[in-house]
Amino acid sequence: VDSVLKEAENLIGNGVKEILLISQDTTYYGRDLSDERATLPELLRGLDKVGGDFWVRVLYTHPAHWSDELVEALAESKRAVKYVDMPLQHIDDWVLSKMRRETTEKKIRELLKKIRAGIPSVAVRTAFIAGFPGETPARFDRLMAFIEEAKFERLGIFSYSKEEGTQAYSMPGHVSARVKQSRFERAMELQQRIAAEVQRSRIGMRLRVLWDAPGVGRTEWDAPGVDGRVYGRGLEKAGTFSVATIEGSTDYDLIAKGGAIPKEDF
């Protein structure tokens, strides 16, 4: 923990405004160390004590390794953004077991309920794989129904890619490229509609924005490179925070008062 905190202090001292905590499974942090303080909740509490004006964003958490303590730590942290990045991959129990995800539909639903109840105004980002070997039409329909119901603020869809050396490579029931593409498109179309609804709900809000460049920033609900943007007037200084009034939206982005989307971004 101390080494991570020291690195964070150095970065913040050099003007960094957002600290990203990321690994293959960030929720597993510290479990392979002898230091009992080396847990993600303890790290978040330590970062709360670091001086400066900055955000902390936790990326790539695993649904099987969350704890009540982590939910509480994220809710109580004055530095951590209210943003949960948790790739679920699927919701069908059979597919989850073949993926070795160590979780079930019931556990996922319970965890999401706990996160949303425990962290007010949280945005949840997830990712799903369409066309995994053995994904029947019924299993895909179950995934689609779950996406419709859960209404994730941020969501990515990936078509299964056959990779030699993986367990799934030799599994029976591989889905054709045509069907995988069709399922990918259907899921993306559904999420695009949901995302547009989420963004419209932000109109009228006054939100804190981190400006990555003049006129281009992000809310706490947007990770760099993968989520939406806030478009401002172009007078904002890169690497600063300000509060912006949201006056418009697109499917994935927000438009602040006096802002406009650059032509090259259409």
Regions found by a protein language model. Give the residues of each.
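C-terminal, non-catalytic macromolecule-binding modules
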Residues: 118, 138, 142-181, 187
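Terminal RNA-binding accessory module
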Residues: 170-266
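Active-site proximal loops enriched in glycine and acidic residues that flank catalytic Cys/His/Asp
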Residues: 23, 60-62, 88-90, 126-130, ...
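Conserved SAM/AdoMet-binding glycine-rich loop
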Residues: 12-138, 148
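Conserved, mostly hydrophobic/aromatic
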Residues: 4, 21, 58, 86, ...
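Conserved SAM/SAH cofactor-binding pocket of Class I
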Residues: 2, 6-16
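Aromatic/hydrophobic pocket-lining residues that form the small-molecule binding cavity
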Residues: 4, 40, 108, 140-143, ...
